[in-house]
Amino acid sequence: MKSLWFLYRIIRAKCKPYFLSLLQMTANKPSESIELVLASPRGFCAGVDRAITIVEKALQIYGSPIYVQHEIVHNKHVVQRLRESGAIFVENINEIPLGSRAIYSAHGVSPAVRKIAERRKLKVLDATCPLVTKVHGEAQRYAQKDYTIILIGHHKHVEVQGTVGEAPKRIIVVGNLEEVDNLVVPDENKVGYITQTTLSLDDTAEIISALKKRFPKIQGPAKNDICYATQNRQNAVKALSKEVDLVLVVGAPNSSNSVRLLEVARTTGVKARRIESEEELNPEWFKGIRSIGVTAGASAPEDILQGVVSGLKKMFSSSNVRDLNIVQENVTFALPAVLRSA
C-alpha cells in the first residue's frame, strides 16, 4: 500500500502542472456563445455620405484624375477605395495642377484656400458638410458685428483650421476650461461662440457653462447647430454600454468622432476598444465576455463594421446578433447642382 501511495503522489506531482494549465486555458478562452449588439444609428452620417458620393459621381462623369483637398473623410479604407478609382488626395491646394478638377473635403476649407483655387482656375466641387458651412456662416456674421468669436474645438483638427480662416483675427480656439480662464477679449459685451461640428452637446457643455460665467452677454448658436449625427451616435453608445460587457468602436485613430465614442463608452464604466477593421480583433480581449456592443464612427463604412461582426462570429461557437435602435435618422443633403443634373 505504501508503494501505491508513493506512486500516486509522484503521478499527482508530475500531472498537476498539466491540469492547472488545462484549467487556465479553459478559463482564458472566450465564452462558447456570444451576444452581439449593434448600435443604431452608427457609421456614415449624411455629410460623409454626401462627400463620398460627390467624389464617386465626379469620377464617373469626368474621369480621372480628380484632386481632393485633404482626405475626403477620416477613414483610410474609404480613401484607399477612392484612390484606386482615380482620386488624388493632396494636403496643399497648390499641389493641384492649373485648371484641374478639385473637390474640397467634408471638413471645409478657409476663404484663403478658395482664393488660391480661383487663381489656379480650378474647377471646384464643394463637398463641405452643410453643417460645417453653417458654422462658417455663424463666424462670418459675428465677424461682421466686430465680435470676438470663441471656437470650441480641437486646435489641430482640419475643420477647426478651416473655420478659423473665416476670421483669423477674431477667432480664438478653446479646447478646455483652462483656456477659457486665460481668455482676454477687447470687449466682453461683444463675444460669441461657435463649435466644431464633431463635438456634441455633452462635449461642449462644461466649456459653454464656463464661457457664460466669464462673459454673461455671450451669444451662441441654437442647439440645432450641433451636429445631429455626433449627438445621436454618442447617445446610442451610452445606451449600448448599459447592455454589454465590452464595446468595440469601429473607426480611424484620426477620426475625432470615433475617438470620442470610445471615450464616451469608457466614461460609463464599460470596457471599450477602438479598431479600424476585422484584422485588429484579438481573442484575448474576449475572455469571460458574454456580450459585445459594436458601433462605428461617422466616417466608418458599414461593410467594415459588418466585417468586424463576421470576425467576432468566427471566434465563438454560436452567436446572437441584434440591433439596439435609439433614434431613426432620415437626414440627407443634396449634391451640388452640376452633379444632380448630370
Predicted regions mapped to residue ranges:
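The feature marks the mature, well-folded catalytic cores of soluble enzymes
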Residues: 19-296, 302-342
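Short terminal hydrophobic/aromatic SLiMs and anchors at protein ends
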Residues: 8-9, 15
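Generic short N-terminal amphipathic or hydrophobic helices
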Residues: 9-10, 33
